[in-house]
């Protein structure tokens, strides 16, 4: 990444996520986004963010706070400054995963914005979506929704080059006093085919470290269907998700 930042940490009384932000293709697209949401009768506001240009804020239909911007202070690339790589060596933020009380409605809203579904889980008895993974940048997903009480963030994810980066992280965490912060994994998801581990920071925020998914640049990509009762949809192999 060459943007000034992809994550902002602020001290507060309670752990929470204040908003999710997406960069658009041009300054004109910020105005198009404002017109798009206003045309739906949604309240919008312009907010000031450090190191960013004009930033639009809106709540999605279930109350998830979203922000859209184009301009951000750029930094020199660190891609080949290997001496600066530390820990798990994350290369970019990859996606957000949120709970939604109505996944069908969430998918329709984000589809109208230009997101496309790559994989989904459907409840065969009701015909409704249980979960969906949606993309913009050509990976498996930039945002995903799972049926549940919301708006609520399940996790953010960072992409790393190989599974060995995840193994290295686990070695470091297990020998520096953070073994109890390893929540789940390593394992491989059925959905996305990604190699993963979930970790918790001291405040309980969940982060997924993630690699080995696939590209979705084919415009004819057909969304992959998973049955809700398939136990390998969440975990192809590895420990099951905690309840």
Segments from the language model and where they lie:
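Core segments of cupin and vicinal oxygen chelate
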Residues: 1-4, 47-50, 57, 98-140, ...
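Short beta-strand/turn micro-motifs at beta-sheet edges
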Residues: 7-9, 82-85, 143-146
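A compositional/structural signature marking long, glycine- and acidic/polar-rich segments
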Residues: 122-137, 141-190
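Short, basic, helix/turn surface patches
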Residues: 13-20, 72-76, 146-152, 208-216
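Short, charged/polar, Gly/Pro-enriched secondary-structure boundary elements
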Residues: 3-8, 63-67, 139-143, 205
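Catalytic cores of nucleotide-enabled group-transfer and carboxylate-activating enzymes in metabolic
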Residues: 2-16, 24-26, 39-41, 45, ...
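Vicinal oxygen chelate
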Residues: 11-101, 120, 129-134, 149-243, ...
């Amino acid at each position: 990444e060459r943007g000034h930042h992809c994550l902002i940490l602020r001290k507060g009384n309670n752990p929470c996520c204040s908003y999710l932000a997406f960069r658009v293709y041009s300054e004109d697209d910020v105005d198009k986004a404002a017109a798009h949401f206003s045309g739906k009768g949604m309240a919008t506001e312009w907010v000031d963010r450090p190191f960013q240009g004009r930033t639009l804020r809106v709540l999605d239909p279930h109350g998830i706070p979203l922000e859209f911007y184009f301009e951000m202070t750029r930094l020199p690339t660190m891609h080949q400054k290997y001496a600066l790589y530390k820990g798990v060596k994350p290369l970019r933020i990859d996606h957000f995963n949120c709970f939604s009380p109505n996944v069908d409605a969430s998918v329709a809203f984000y589809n109208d914005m230009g997101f496309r579904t790559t994989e989904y889980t459907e409840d065969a008895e009701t015909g409704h979506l249980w979960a969906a993974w949606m993309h913009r940048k050509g990976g498996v997903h930039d945002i995903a929704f799972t049926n549940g009480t919301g708006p609520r963030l399940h996790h953010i994810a960072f992409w790393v080059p190989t599974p060995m980066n995840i193994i290295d992280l686990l070695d470091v965490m297990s020998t520096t006093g953070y073994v109890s912060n390893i929540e789940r994994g390593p394992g491989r998801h059925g959905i996305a085919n990604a190699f993963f581990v979930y970790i918790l920071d001291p405040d309980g925020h969940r982060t997924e470290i993630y690699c080995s998914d696939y590209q979705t640049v084919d415009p004819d990509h057909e969304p992959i269907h998973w049955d809700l009762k398939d136990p390998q949809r969440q975990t192809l192999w590895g420990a099951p998700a905690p309840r």
